[in-house]
Amino acid sequence: MNLNRFERYPLTFGPSPITPLKRLSQHLGGKVELYAKREDCNSGLAFGGNKTRKLEYLIPEAIEQGCDTLVSIGGIQSNQTRQVAAVAAHLGMKCVLVQENWVNYSDAVYDRVGNIEMSRIMGADVRLDAAGFDIGIRPSWEKAMSDVVEQGGKPFPIPAGCSEHPYGGLGFVGFAEEVRQQEKELGFKFDYIVVCSVTGSTQAGMVVGFAADGRSKNVIGIDASAKPEQTKAQILRIARHTAELVELGREITEEDVVLDTRFAYPEYGLPNEGTLEAIRLCGSLEGVLTDPVYEGKSMHGMIEMVRRGEFPEGSKVLYAHLGGAPALNAYSFLFRNG
């Protein structure tokens, strides 16, 4: 496998830390050891997160092409758009963000706090659009790019989750390589890796990266899209493409992609009671914050799998914390009493 053939523009502090979740592990019976790899604190750019790792492999292309404006898309509380705005500010580029109405939720300040607030503070041109949730290419995003061209700019397109970009999976191949090095330092290997999946490239990169040492099926995706067929197909497609890019040496098959669909309900962006319990439990036991859209659902999935005995006793499980805590502000009513 050859990831080093691709240029990387450093936007993170370096390898994200791995920390034990000792109190959560004990609370759940102590038979499974839980750890977290902290992508939520991987960068000094507006709280970082998993998209910042992905952008390290996209930005060299933007610079090489002489682009002056990063154009991206997401929901109103998109973590991706916040991270794109931060990177644009850091590089001295302009930023246009399309924020669609992906979530059927209306807190009084939903479109004024959290991720979207930070994007505005960082100087992004934020455009609200009424279109609903979809993980594909969107007309509103294409129009934003044509607007930049009409105004004499040169846009660089960054799709939702970076996932439709040819290099969208590379960052999390690097994640797997980091984990292998950290395992040498820790003196053990993780039996399972748990990760949230929606647009697909995070899990796709992990599948490829861990396929290099035979652990692709140990990457357990927790669907948060509530459109699992579309998400799984996208993970598989991106993983196959990424495997070719990094010269993995074998084909990625459907069996390599594990996606648990039990925890996404009722729909994208809306937490269920298990999501909220997981957010409160992890927060109160570990001081680690997760959000109602993504990480709260993957944390719920991991907690329930431990409770149900789905991880063999003695397993060491690595939770990929992808970030997203700024979105908590947009769900303040749900946590008005803690």
Swiss-Prot record:
The keyword Hydrolase applies. It comes from the Bacteria. Introduced by genetic manipulation and expressed in improved ripening tomato by Monsanto. ACC is the immediate precursor of the phytohormone ethylene which is involved in the control of ripening. ACC deaminase reduces ethylene biosynthesis and thus extends the shelf life of fruits and vegetables. NCBIfam families: ACC_deam. Pfam families: PALP. One of its GO terms (biological process) is amine catabolic process. It is an enzyme of class 3 (hydrolase). The gene is acdS. Belongs to the ACC deaminase/D-cysteine desulfhydrase family. Its cofactor is pyridoxal 5'-phosphate. The active site is at residue 78. This is 1-aminocyclopropane-1-carboxylate deaminase. Keywords: Genetically modified food, Hydrolase, Pyridoxal phosphate. The modification N6-(pyridoxal phosphate)lysine is found at residue 51. Transmembrane segments: none annotated. It catalyses: 1-aminocyclopropane-1-carboxylate + H2O = 2-oxobutanoate + NH4(+). GO terms for molecular function: 1-aminocyclopropane-1-carboxylate deaminase activity; D-cysteine desulfhydrase activity; pyridoxal phosphate binding. Homotrimer. Its EC number is 3.5.99.7. InterPro entries: ACCD_DCysDesulf, ACP_carboxylate_deaminase, ACP_carboxylate_deaminase_bac, TrpB-like_PALP, TrpB-like_PALP_sf. Catalyzes a cyclopropane ring-opening reaction, the irreversible conversion of 1-aminocyclopropane-1-carboxylate (ACC) to ammonia and alpha-ketobutyrate. Allows growth on ACC as a nitrogen source. The keyword Signal does not apply.
